[in-house]
A protein has these predicted regions:
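Juxtamembrane intracellular "pre-TM" segments in multi-pass secondary transporters
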Residues: 3, 7-27, 209-307, 502-513
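Helix-loop boundary and gating motifs at the non-cytosolic
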Residues: 8, 12-81, 108-111, 118-121, ...
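Hydrophobic core of transmembrane alpha-helices in multi-pass small-molecule transporters
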Residues: 35, 39, 108-109, 116-137, ...
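Glycine-rich segments within core transmembrane alpha-helices of 12-TM secondary carriers
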Residues: 71, 75-81, 150-181, 185-189, ...
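Conserved MFS/SLC helix-loop-helix module at the cytosolic interface between two early adjacent transmembrane helices
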Residues: 79-118
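Helix-to-loop junctions at the C-terminal end of transmembrane segments
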Residues: 80-94, 175-179, 354-372, 453
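C-terminal ends and interior cores of transmembrane alpha-helices
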Residues: 101-117, 129, 202-204, 378-394
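Symmetry-related core transmembrane helices of the 12-TM Major Facilitator Superfamily/SLC fold
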Residues: 185-205, 465-484
Length: 514
């Protein structure tokens, strides 16, 4: 007679399947995979030595070709695909774009290794622009597969691991170059292997069931507490402070949202998933875009947010231009064919010090709403001084030091700006403002590139370029210094008026008798 009870092997197999299922449903599983992808996709030992590689015997390109014909393509590519990739990322629910980013990064590295000539390198820069635009999928993916209460930890891990990858790549590249352990081409082969690992890891990521705009979580229940309305799809009114971020670490702190989300997950086991998700069809895509436009207008109706966003766009534009072309300046000051260079070590130090600066700013007790604009102007001025010293001193160690100082100042200020902007926005609106500010920075960067750098424009050499960048930050400093001084003067005037009003309105002395 056949036994109806499961055998020992069947029980063990069932336990293993349950264990695997439990691990995959835990928030650590997608976070770990994403961090592995983020690490291997950012370890690039050759990146600090890209100019010596392109202008050396491997590619035989001139500095003018790299500066005026090849590098500008990245800016144009990035601008042209940023908005389509941003919308497509949400439409296909993140993972396909993460995989696509890994594929294009692999193609970029392969072209850098095997392709030759200016047109081929321009095509390589185009693909790298697509890689950069696809970065939005990396930072957005994790929010669609974990609970709201895990946002801060997951964001911290995913951003920190990228910084670790860049730092490890820079240090590794410096060691390989300084000790003559590997040629530039072999370093690219090594990078290709790491990119292949990142590609395989991206394929293992779980597919999200929801997204921020086109596949929202749907529920009929809406809760209101103390006049603040919160919805189970994760959106909240703009008046609620739902994001407490040090370096754009988004975390919704509303308790009702967390409870409703957890309740949905428990009830979701007994209900059809189609009831929990509201997928936007083709007819509703226009409605989503209209809603995005309404949110955009409402976000930028705040004058304070506009000031911070203007600085964000202006400073990010100048920062990107400086970082993109700083290796050309280093090569001009001290050609790599003559002496040893330490680009990798400088990049590693700048990354670590920038991270420490951005982290430390979160523990400073300052009223940024009052003193923030003055800080933006003052530290932007220091950044301009660093750029002027890099441009005119003509010493490689001054260039290295100025670059580290400039990068630390920018990272500190962009952290303050991110926090101030995020303080009164829901996650969806913060993502919208974040994308709009970066798009504005990219438009400005494209204008500067086409006029100043491109061979079809002025095609200036590197010293006039950096003179313009330093002057650019000087203008930013003057504007925000004046604005900051005005803000402080107005705050003190309002305080005096309030004090005078309180004194004049206070009742006379009344004697109290027992």
């Amino acid at each position: 007679m056949r036994s109806e009870f499961p055998t020992r092997k069947q029980v063990e197999k069932q336990k293993k399947m349950e264990t695997v299922k439990r691990l995959k449903s835990d928030w650590r599983y997608p976070t770990t995979l994403l961090c592995i992808y983020g690490f291997f996709s950012t370890v690039k030992p050759l990146e600090p030595f890209l100019i010596p590689f392109l202008t050396g015997s491997d590619k035989n390109l001139t500095t003018e070709q790299v500066n005026n014909q090849i590098f500008p393509v990245w800016t144009y590519s990035y601008l042209s695909v940023l908005v389509p990739v941003f919308l497509l990322t949400d439409w296909v629910r993140y993972k396909p774009v993460v995989v696509f980013q890994a594929i294009t990064l692999f193609v970029t590295t392969a072209m850098l290794l095997w392709a030759n000539g200016v047109p081929a390198m321009q095509a390589m820069q185009f693909f790298y622009g697509v890689v950069t635009a696809s970065e939005v999928a990396y930072f957005s993916y994790i929010y669609s597969v974990i609970d709201l209460k895990r946002y801060r930890k997951a964001t911290s891990y995913s951003r920190s691991i990228q910084l670790l990858g860049y730092t490890v790549g820079s240090v590794l590249g410096q060691l390989l170059v300084s000790l003559n352990l590997m040629s530039y081409r072999n370093m690219l082969v090594f990078t290709l292997v790491l990119t292949g690992i990142a590609l395989l890891t991206s394929c293992l990521l779980p597919m999200p069931q929801q997204s921020m705009f086109f596949h929202r979580k749907h529920t009929r229940q809406t809760t209101t507490t103390e006049g603040i309305e919160s919805h189970a799809d994760g959106t909240v009114d703009a008046t609620e402070r739902t994001i407490r971020s040090k370096v754009s670490l988004e975390e919704t702190t509303d308790i009702n949202v967390e409870k409703s989300t957890e309740k949905e997950k428990e009830e979701g086991k007994n209900t059809d998933k189609s009831e929990d998700l509201e997928t936007v069809g083709g007819e509703s895509c226009g409605q989503v875009l209209v809603q995005l436009w309404r949110d955009f207008r409402q976000c930028y109706s705040s004058r304070q947010l506009i000031y911070w966003s203007v600085w964000w766009a202006l400073a990010t534009c100048g920062y990107n231009q400086t970082v993109n072309y700083v290796q050309v300046l280093w090569e001009h000051v001290q050609p790599s064919q003559n002496v040893s260079i330490y680009n990798g070590g400088v990049e590693a130090v700048s990354n670590l010090m920038s991270a420490a600066t951005a982290y430390g700013i979160g523990f400073t007790e300052v009223r940024w709403d009052q003193w923030g604009e003055l800080a933006l102007g003052s530290f932007s001025g220091l950044g301009a001084v660093a750029l002027f010293l890099m441009t005119f001193i003509g010493n490689i160690w001054v260039c290295y030091t100025g670059y580290i100082v400039f990068k630390c100042l920018y990272m500190m200020l962009i952290t303050i700006a991110m926090y101030q902007i995020a303080a009164d926005l829901s996650m969806e609106r913060y993502a919208l403002v974040f994308g709009a500010n970066n798009f504005g920075a990219l438009v400005l960067q494209t204008i500067i590139t086409s006029v100043v750098v491109d061979s079809r424009g002025l095609a200036l050499s590197i010293i006039p370029q950096f003179t313009i960048y330093a002057s650019y930050f000087s203008v930013i400093a003057v504007v925000f210094l004046l604005r900051g001084l005005f803000t402080i003067w107005r705050a003190k005037r309002n305080k005096r008026e309030t004090t005078s009003s309180d004194i004049s309105d206070s009742p006379g002395f009344v004697e109290h008798r027992l």
